[in-house]
UniProtKB/Swiss-Prot annotation:
Disulfide bonds: none
Role, per record: Catalyzes the transformation of pimelate into pimeloyl-CoA with concomitant hydrolysis of ATP to AMP.
Entries under InterPro entries matching the protein: BioW
The keyword Ligase is assigned to this record: yes
Cofactor: Mg(2+)
Entry EC no(s): 6.2.1.14
Designated name of the protein: 6-carboxyhexanoate--CoA ligase
Organism of this sequence: Methanococcus maripaludis (strain C5 / ATCC BAA-1333)
Subunit structure: Homodimer.
Listed pathway(s): Metabolic intermediate metabolism; pimeloyl-CoA biosynthesis; pimeloyl-CoA from pimelate: step 1/1
Gene that this polypeptide is encoded by: bioW
NCBIfam families attached to this UniProt entry: PRK01322.1
Length: 244
């Protein structure tokens, strides 16, 4: 197996990124698809594209995908309240476990929304329960690497007309993240026209319509219990995972 990693930018601003795990005979085909994806991105034609291909020598871990649940909402305000409640329900368990003030959870979630609304990060921000950012490089964040979905799962998802390639990408990331010890994830898309975002916890992948406005940037935040950041980085970046 080979890991393919694509990232594209324009004037130093992140435009697109994608990860795939493929057999040798598919490298050329998938590489072409990733470059085409970067060049046709709605956020603009990039002036820089990096495509990295590496042989994977470690065992591929197979993970069952999180259950996909779609939450319908017609306003950004309502959608964000839904996301907030999903996050609070999960975070509260860890606040109580660690003897922390649950009244501080809203502040943590406010900070997370501020991060994703600022956008222009290639990867995700990581927040501990005290609101500390734990990424090695704040402007870059952490990229979840060495991931893919099986062809069967991809085909199953895309048979649903309400789901897209973005869902396929996101379910791979969310499933790996939750299985690496992240409490929950909050995400909105980089694509200006795509307003659906999600919250992921061990209970599922919750697609929430209208989580941001059209034309708005996107971002990703991981909530973690402890600060074993080196171990988390190693898993998220290096552990090969296929989601089925």
């Amino acid at each position: 197996m080979f890991s393919l990693k694509m990232r594209a930018s324009r004037n130093g601003n992140h435009v697109s990124g994608a990860e795939r795990l493929v057999n040798e005979e598919k490298i050329e085909k998938i590489s072409s698809e990733l470059i085409k994806r970067a060049m046709s991105h709605e956020n603009g034609v990039p002036d820089f594209i990096n495509l990295k291909i590496e042989k994977v020598t470690e065992k591929i871990n197979k993970l069952k995908h999180l259950e996909i649940k779609t939450v319908h909402s017609t306003s950004k305000e309502n959608s964000r309240n839904i996301a907030r409640n999903l996050l609070k329900n999960e975070l509260e368990k860890y606040y109580l476990k660690n003897g922390k003030d649950i009244e501080k959870i809203d502040e943590l979630i406010d900070f997370a929304f501020k991060i994703i609304d600022a956008g222009n990060m290639r990867g995700a921000a990581i927040l501990d329960l005290d609101g500390n950012r734990l990424e090695n490089i704040l402007e870059r964040g952490i990229r979840v690497k060495n991931i893919d979905t099986t062809e069967e799962l991809s085909e199953k998802i895309l048979k649903d007309s309400s789901l897209t390639e973005r869902t396929v990408d996101a379910i791979a990331i969310a499933t790996k993240v939750v299985n690496c010890g992240v409490i929950s994830e909050l995400c909105t898309s980089d694509n200006f026209s795509y307003t659906t975002g999600y919250v992921a916890t061990k209970d599922g992948y919750f697609r929430i319509l209208n989580l941001k406005d059209k034309g708005q940037v996107g971002g990703r935040v991981f909530f973690v219990e402890n600060s074993k950041i080196d171990e988390l980085y190693d898993k998220l970046e290096n552990m090969p995972v296929t989601v089925y």
